[in-house]
């Protein structure tokens, strides 16, 4: 006689074991129809799984994020169902849930085309609209293997042989004649899986190993209702328009090429963006009293072994040999900063010591994961390390948090998700050390009135950390900033200071990054602004255009005045119609377009318009310069008169 306790505290008693679906039906037919799965005593279960003991139960519907992820997983099975109907010879590998959707890896000799994907999507919809029940059957390991052997599903057999114990009881999910294997849960009926779209097909190695066979990975997205699906697809369309790779080419910002995969060739305008970003962060460093240093690009393997990075990162490090010594190009800056700290005796009076670097780092990322500026092999970190005492940790972390928020606000990012990762099972130090460290981070967040989520056990073995994830205009999440306590590296590399009692003590090291990678952050900004950078950041801030040759000298004089005042300005004296010039520089996203005709020249004025076509009228050169200087110095996100 199980007693079921619901989230509101109410209880329901049943004579026999019941399923989540039974409980939902007991509450009401509407909830039964909406029920996708259940969370029983904190564990997700299929709606059909029986509950035989007193339990806490939350009924999962498509209104819950968990429900959406379950229906996405079931859409992957639906995809498998459709594939096997259209190409019975296909072998199904794995079909997991990913952000906003799902995929399935398929072994199929026939190369899937855009037309195939369209036909596959239609077959999926035809199947889903029959509203068939998904039948779950828990079997022995041997029964599962026999079932897939009969079907020739070699990848399912491999999963059973290599990943599942023979004592296990796998769950098989039957979609009419199609059978798949999964830990679940899945939807009870395919009426939940009718708001989806197949997005693309790509190659993927089995098990992610290039020594294995290349499979075809079909990606899809799925949502709880048509409105959510349409919203997502609209966002994807907008994201495609804002793709930094496309805009980077249009605006001549940078390029990449096969001879240097994952390395950026910055062009003049792109490098201007980079330098402005660096200049901005450098000013922040001054405000928060950092030293700026520069460490070597390459160091002996022995140092990386002492730091512990060789054991964990050697596969991702570029190495070279010279004079019988092995060197590694740095994937991070921290060991180099400890070497600088170690030069000369340090006293407690020298702490906190804040050390920052725009460090050029390299990591040997897999070629298949490289993606424009977002995922590169060579990148610049706005990295800093703070050496301090235990008592100073909370204040230093609080300052880091303020620096993060001040910086993100300048770029218009206000939706920041903060997560605090706490002690993992395997860790250095005693519980008292971790209690103090975690409490210092918590109090720093609370003091700054920051809402945060705690991720138990997700910290590094050497200390807890705070992660800052910003959300852009399309509500995409970008994890950029981090504040990480480190109680291990200073000790490993012999960093000490003389304490007030004249004993040698090891400092706490705080790793902190604001932007993370400058290259990646610029990619985010290109997409956030769709190439329409704020004036202070724009590679070219003003372009001055003449209507006829008669104004050419005056236009050049105006540009000279602007340049002397530190405004990035250029002129366009081409013998083209003024409308053509305006359109061209509008496409280049230049913030201010200044037109000069006879009247403007005679009155020592310029006619001002913005790249968005707003006519600001005529102004004297001095008035416009004064206004744009205010625009630039304030780092305004808006143009004049917006």
Swiss-Prot record:
This protein's name: Threonine--tRNA ligase
Segments of this protein annotated with the region Catalytic: 243-534
Superkingdom as given in the UniProt entry: Bacteria
Any one cellular-component term (Gene Ontology): cytosol
Catalytic EC class: ligase
Cofactor binding note of this UniProt entry: Binds 1 zinc ion per subunit.
Summary of the function given for this chain in its UniProt record: Catalyzes the attachment of threonine to tRNA(Thr) in a two-step reaction: L-threonine is first activated by ATP to form Thr-AMP and then transferred to the acceptor end of tRNA(Thr). Also edits incorrectly charged L-seryl-tRNA(Thr).
Location of this chain's protein in the cell: Cytoplasm
NCBIfam families: thrS
NADP is among the record's keywords: no
Keyword Repeat: no
Catalysed reactions, as listed in the record: tRNA(Thr) + L-threonine + ATP = L-threonyl-tRNA(Thr) + AMP + diphosphate + H(+)
Principal subcellular localisation of the protein: cytoplasm
Family annotation (CDD domains): TGS_ThrRS (cd01667), ThrRS_anticodon (cd00860), ThrRS_core (cd00771)
Assembly and binders: Homodimer.
Species lineage: Bacteria, Pseudomonadati, Pseudomonadota, Gammaproteobacteria, Alteromonadales
Residue positions binding Zn(2+): 334, 385, 511
Pfam family, one: HGTP_anticodon
Sequence ranges assigned to domain TGS in this UniProt record: 1-61
Keywords attached to this entry: Aminoacyl-tRNA synthetase, ATP-binding, Cytoplasm, Ligase, Metal-binding, Nucleotide-binding, Protein biosynthesis, RNA-binding, tRNA-binding, Zinc
């Amino acid at each position: 006689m199980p007693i079921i306790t619901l989230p509101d505290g109410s209880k329901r008693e049943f004579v026999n074991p019941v399923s989540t679906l039974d409980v939902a039906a007991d509450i009401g037919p509407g909830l039964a129809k909406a029920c996708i799965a259940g969370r029983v005593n904190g564990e997700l279960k299929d709606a059909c799984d029986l509950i035989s003991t007193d339990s806490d139960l939350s009924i999962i519907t498509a209104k819950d994020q968990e429900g959406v992820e379950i229906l996405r997983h079931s859409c992957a099975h639906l995809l498998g169902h459709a594939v096997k109907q259209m190409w019975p010879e296909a072998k199904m590998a794995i079909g997991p849930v990913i952000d906003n959707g799902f995929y399935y890896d398929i072994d199929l000799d026939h190369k899937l085309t855009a037309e195939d994907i369209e036909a596959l999507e239609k077959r999926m919809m035809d199947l889903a609209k029959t509203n068939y029940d998904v039948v779950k059957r828990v079997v022995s390991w041997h029964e599962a293997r026999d079932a897939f052997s009969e079907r020739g599903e070699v990848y399912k057999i491999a999963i059973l042989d290599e990943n599942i114990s023979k004592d296990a009881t796998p769950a098989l999910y039957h979609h009419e004649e199609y059978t798949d294997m999964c830990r679940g849960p899945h939807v009870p009926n395919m009426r939940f899986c009718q708001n989806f779209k197949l997005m693309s097909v790509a190659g993927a190695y089995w098990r992610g190993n290039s020594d294995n066979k290349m499979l075809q990975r079909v990606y899809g997205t799925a949502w709880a209702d048509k409105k959510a699906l349409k919203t997502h697809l609209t966002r994807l369309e907008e994201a495609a328009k804002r793709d930094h790779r496309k805009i980077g080419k249009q605006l001549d910002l940078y390029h990449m090429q096969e001879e240097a995969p994952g390395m950026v060739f910055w062009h003049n305008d792109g490098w201007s963006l980079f330098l402005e970003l660096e200049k901005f962060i450098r000013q922040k460093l001054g405000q928060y009293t950092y030293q700026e240093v520069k460490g070597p690009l390459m160091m002996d393997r022995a140092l990386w072994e002492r730091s512990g990075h060789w054991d964990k990162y050697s596969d991702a490090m570029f190495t070279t040999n010279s004079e019988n010594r092995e060197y590694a190009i740095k994937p991070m800056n921290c060991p180099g900063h400890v070497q600088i700290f170690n030069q000369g005796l340090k006293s407690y009076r020298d702490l906190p010591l804040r050390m920052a670097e725009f460090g050029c780092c390299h990591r040997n990322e897999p070629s298949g994961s490289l993606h424009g500026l977002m995922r590169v092999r060579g990148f610049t970190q706005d990295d800093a390390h703070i050496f301090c005492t235990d008592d100073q940790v909370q204040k230093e972390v609080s300052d880091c948090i303020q620096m993060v928020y001040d910086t993100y606000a300048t770029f218009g990012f206000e939706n920041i998700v903060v997560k605090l990762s706490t002690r993992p099972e395997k860790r250095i130090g005693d519980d008292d050390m971790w209690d103090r460290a975690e409490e210092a981070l918590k109090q720093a967040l609370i003091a700054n009135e920051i809402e945060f989520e705690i991720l138990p056990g997700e910290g590094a073995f050497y200390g807890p950390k705070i992660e800052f994830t910003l959300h852009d205009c399309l509500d995409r999440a970008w994890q950029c900033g981090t504040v990480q306590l480190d109680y291990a590296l200073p000790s490993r590399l012999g960093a000490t200071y003389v304490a007030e009692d004249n004993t040698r003590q090891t400092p706490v090291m705080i790793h902190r990054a604001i932007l993370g990678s400058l290259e990646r952050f610029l990619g985010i900004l290109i997409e956030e602004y769709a190439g329409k950078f704020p004036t202070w950041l724009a590679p070219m801030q003003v372009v001055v255009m003449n209507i006829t040759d008669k104004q050419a000298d005056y236009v050049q004089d105006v540009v000279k005045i602007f340049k002397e005042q530190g405004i990035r300005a250029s002129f366009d004296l081409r013998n083209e119609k003024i409308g053509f010039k305006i359109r061209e520089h509008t496409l280049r996203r230049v913030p201010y377009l200044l037109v000069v005709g006879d009247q403007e020249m005679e009155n020592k004025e310029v006619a001002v318009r913005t790249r968005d076509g707003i006519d600001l009228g005529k102004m004297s050169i001095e008035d416009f310069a004064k206004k744009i200087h205010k625009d630039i110095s304030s780092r305004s996100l808006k143009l004049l008169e917006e």
